[in-house]
Design a protein with these regions (language model features):
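Iron-sulfur (Fe-S) cluster-binding modules
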Residues: 1-41, 51-61, 70-133
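A general structural motif
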Residues: 42-46
Length: 133
């Protein structure tokens, strides 16, 4: 079944140059690949691409993952009067913003579990071991 047929929530993420930004993007991609949410393009929303703005303003549940307090993804959506239903600022979840470094995959795996539990409270702990890196 396609993501759109299930009407999954939309997930938007930061994807800037820092380690925390890349972790935000990684987490959004994982939510998409695992069928928890459908990832859409925040750059397109910020760039006023009509099709992508239409998707963002469609009334679907919105999840936003920002890597730092600058909250770029959140602000891009707010410029189109779209507010996140669920918002994550990774800096408030213990993620350090580092330039010219990769993010910690073990930390990302742990955060993915936390995000999924917030997004879908019915997420069962018995499925935790099946989460790929």
């Amino acid at each position: 079944m396609k993501h759109t047929e299930k009407q999954l929530p939309l997930v938007y993420s930061c994807s800037g140059c820092s380690s925390s930004a890349q972790m935000a993007n990684y987490l959004a991609v994982q939510l998409d690949r695992q069928g928890v949410a459908e990832m859409s393009c925040i750059a397109g929303v910020g760039g006023n691409v009509k099709k992508l703005v239409k998707t963002a303003t469609s009334g679907r549940k919105i999840i936003v993952i920002d890597g730092c307090p600058l909250a770029c993804s959140k602000h891009c959506l707010e410029n189109h009067a779209v507010n996140a239903d669920i918002y994550f600022d990774l800096s408030l979840m213990g993620v350090s913003k580092k330039l010219h470094e990769d993010f910690c995959h073990l930390q990302a795996k742990a955060l993915l579990i936390q995000l999924k539990q917030v997004i879908d409270p019915s997420f069962k702990k018995s499925r935790l071991n099946s989460i790929p890196l």
